[in-house]
Amino acid sequence: MNLKELERWPRQHDIKNHELFGTEHFGTEAPCVVYELKPVIDPKGNPVPGCNTAWVTLNNPAQFNSYTTEMVKGVIAGMQKASADRTVVACIFTGTGSDAFCTGGNTKEYAEYYSMNGTEYGYYMDLFNAMVDGILNCKKPVICRVNGMRVAGGQEIGLACDLAISSDLAIFGQAGPRHGSAPVGGSCDFLPAFMTAEQAMWSCVSCEMWSAYKMQNVGMITKAVPVLKVDGKFIRNPSVITDAYVQDGAIVYGENKTGDAAAEAKAIRKTATVDFSLLDAEVNKIVYTFTNLFPNCLMMSIDGIRAKKKFFWDQSKLPNRHWLVANMQSEAYLGFNAFNNKKATGKDVIDFVKYRQLLNDKAPYTTEFFEAVMAPPKDK
């Protein structure tokens, strides 16, 4: 076969379609998942013919890109569609807007549909597990483009990705123990692979939010990139201390400013504009690197590293699914409903001290128990 015959080969032969899904799980109107192909960009800014990126975008900005049941299906479909597309070099997993990549499951849906309905939540968790599996099994590299806060379940699906490039405005952390759940959708499995056991422990249980620079420092993301512009020039996130310093004998980096410095930084952020061009340039740089590697050797290498993540994830995802079903009848009901009712009550958490006191007195879970620990409406 000569070169001209080889170039005509695809046009002369039928190519089988290995995609499981069409476009039925994607949309354009929030809440939804948006799926689109974009060309790979070379270092000179030119599109590379025949080479694309698949963008899987969580589109629910009004609720900080929290994923509904239908959106979970969209992520599963997006990962499989990217896997089966011969033109796709890498999958870019991101969110709409500049506030959030994802804040996890949709708390309104959790509170109003799944709480006190554990069996239904079990079906939902089967989909959630398939979403994490879909990311870990995608046959293209998955880059998490962190356009804003990556919290709770958003942190977990982000950790399942292969690499993360983040806006330096983003914050990272868990919310489960504060809001009625536990970070058993991946964080308990993945965080010890990124940081020390004690750092992973504190991140999981404290619900403390860490900056993108701190995440880069502990090795949890590849790079934090400035996205704020003042007078046409990029500046680093003014709310974060981005120079290393010594505190109590330890080197500290990426901590949030406090007091007057925090107030000054907040004022700067109000006048600045958000521009993701540097963030996207970093994503393009990684994708172009992938484009210039043998694709099967690339995926063998990635799957070899993913296997370590998958080992721990596969050990725990099914027992965790069953625990979450049971938990939806108790603490999850309280946590999700407290968060969902915060506009009416002014508080997004229960009275934890009262809750512990009632448990100490062996009080049964009843309607009266729940009412005793939930914040009353503000007008009462």
What are these model-derived regions, one by one?
Residues 1-52, 86, 98, 211-213, ...:
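C-terminal alpha-helix plus adjacent terminal tail
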Residues 5-27, 95-131, 150, 178-180, ...:
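Glycine- (often His-adjacent) and acidic-residue-rich active-site loop
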Residues 49-59, 73-116, 133-144, 163, ...:
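A structural preference for short, pocket-lining loop segments at secondary-structure junctions
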Residues 56, 75, 93, 157-158, ...:
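Hydrophobic alpha-helical segments that mediate membrane insertion or helix-helix packing
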Residues 64-67:
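Short amphipathic alpha-helices within nucleic acid-binding modules
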Residues 71-75, 124-127, 279-282:
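Hydrophobic alpha-helical membrane-association signature
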Residues 134-295:
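Crotonase-fold acyl-CoA enzyme core
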